[in-house]
Amino acid sequence: ESGNGVPDALDEVAWELKWLLKMQSPSGAVAHKLSVTDWSGTSPPSTDPGARYFAPDTASATISCCGAFAHAAIVSSAQGDPASQTFGAQLQQAALDAWAWLDANPGLIPSYYNNQGFSSVACEDLPYDQDMNRLRAAAYLFELTSDVVYRDWVDQSHTRAHLFQWSWVSPWEDVAQSGLLRYAIHPGATASVSGAILTAYRDEVSGVDHLGHFQAVDDPYRAYLSDGDHSWGSNRTKALQGEAFMRMDTLGLDPGQAPLYRAAARGYLHYIHGVNPVGLCFLTHMDAHGAERSMRETYHLWFADGTIWDRVGVTFGPPPGYLVGGVNPNYAPDGSYN
């Protein structure tokens, strides 16, 4: 739509990535966050005059950005225009710099950022999640550079994933699972490790904890999650569970039951689109795109009461196509509510 020859989704991602690049210091480390110290804010964000402060550099932020930069470098470098390819090279160097900082500072891994001076959420990752984020970063860096250093990292660390420790596939483990699968399908991956990853994933998703719930019709809306998984951001959890079934099909891990996996995945898509207890399409403002009852407003500071993005029918409402958080029986307002 922007007319620059690049998909708009990639333009949006590039805008975010350029901000993340500003968070990286010359050392390769990345600041944990940049935020106001309280819950203040305004809409649109470009009019917000509040002072913002950097948190310190942390291993968790550096690890996460390392993987994001490497993944984005692969995508950007594959575009046909010179600007995207140049940006891809910049992202690759940023990923390499982040990895080099991590290698040079093993004593700072994992990080335990305490959010000192801020009221907003700290968003520190658990040590296990930092480990899995780095595994995924290694998988993308191996694909990007073909350097066996990153292959060896995955080979030596993959069994620490819950996929192997607990024989567990979960929508809460997508960081680890997506990294492992990305590595497993790479032609340069160590064959024994690749085979172990694909077998472990297949055996779990084809079993009672995943396909079994679909076959038993344990959810009348065909989008099963356990009660405890209906929490903050449950629509994301639903979508990732559906993706687990799609991976079984797209990777050909159990071809004899491929129609079942596709049907199971569709259940989660239909749930998002309106086949759910409240009969709502959980995407915002989709009236012009075929939805009869899409979300007319959403709880977000940028689309707050009194703004032109407040509610469809009263004002313009939120932009089309945003996925709202979803059902959450444990919801309680935090400091940003007021």
Please provide the spans of the model-predicted regions.
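Proline-centered turn/helix-capping motifs that create local helix->coil transitions or kinks
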Residues: 24-34, 107-111, 146-149
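Carboxylate/His-rich catalytic cores and anion/metal-binding grooves
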Residues: 7-29
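Flexible helix-coil transition and linker loops at the boundaries of alpha-helical arrays
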Residues: 81, 108-112, 122-124
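N-terminal module-boundary/linker segments of secreted carbohydrate-active enzymes
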Residues: 74-80, 85-91
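Aromatic (Trp/Tyr) and acidic
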Residues: 1, 6, 18, 33-75, ...
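Solenoid-like repeat scaffolds
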Residues: 159-167
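Hydrophobic, small-residue-rich alpha-helical packing segments that form membrane-like cores
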Residues: 89, 93-100, 104-107, 111
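Short, solvent-exposed loop/turn and secondary-structure capping segments
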Residues: 25, 31-35, 78, 114, ...
